[in-house]
Amino acid sequence: MKEALDTEKLINCARKFCSCQSKVYRSELFGITDGKAVGTFVEHLFKDFLAQQYDLTMGNSANGLDLPSVNTDIKVTSIKQPQSSCPYKDSKQRIYGLGYNLIVFVYQKEDDETNKKGMLNFLSCTYIDSSRTADYQTTIGLHNIINNKGNADDIYAFLADRNIPADEVTLYQMAQDILKNPPTIGYLTISNALQWRLQYSRIVSLEDNVSGITSIVKYDGK
C-alpha cells in the first residue's frame, strides 16, 4: 500500500523530478511554443511521477487544484516571462493570499532541429506556502501604513489606489479588517484581469531565506 502524499514528500519528489526530467529530449515537445501546452504536459508528467510513488487525490485546472490532498496547485512557466493565471475568487486574495499552496516549475525550452525533439531544462522550482501567496507590493504597503500609525481611512485610500476590485463599502470593510488583522507579506506579483495574473520573478530571484518559501531548485541566473 502506498504512503499518502504530504508536503515534505511533494517537495522531495519535485526535486527528483526536476533532476531526472531536465534535458530529456522528447518528440512530443518539438516545435511547441504554446506555454499552456508545455505547462499541461509537465503537469501530467509530474502527477504521474507522484502517483507512481504515493497515494494522492488528483484534481485538474477545470475543477480546482491539481493536488487537492496537499492543498497545492502546480504552475509551470517559462523563464522568459515567469507568470501564469489563476481563477479569481475574492478580492482579498491579493491581500491575504490565494488560500492554497503553489509549486512553481520554471523551465527553459530548447529544440533539437536535427532529431526533431524538444527538451525542458528546469532552472527553478519553488514551493510557496499559502501564507506567502499574496501580492508583495500591496502587503508591504499595508504594513508600512500600519507601522506608521495609519488608520482605516489611510488603508482604504491605499486599496483604492491599488485598484483592488471591490466597491467602496466592501473596500472600507476590508480596510477595517486589515487594521485588526494585518496580512503576512506575500511574495507574488498579482495583477487584475478576468483572472488573477501571477508573476514569479521575485520568487525565482529570491536570495533570502523566507519562512513558507522552499527553494527546491535554485536559479543561478545563467
Placement of each model-derived feature along the sequence:
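Acidic/His-rich structured neighborhood in mature extracellular/periplasmic domains
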Residues: 72
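Nucleic-acid endonuclease domains
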Residues: 1-68, 76-222
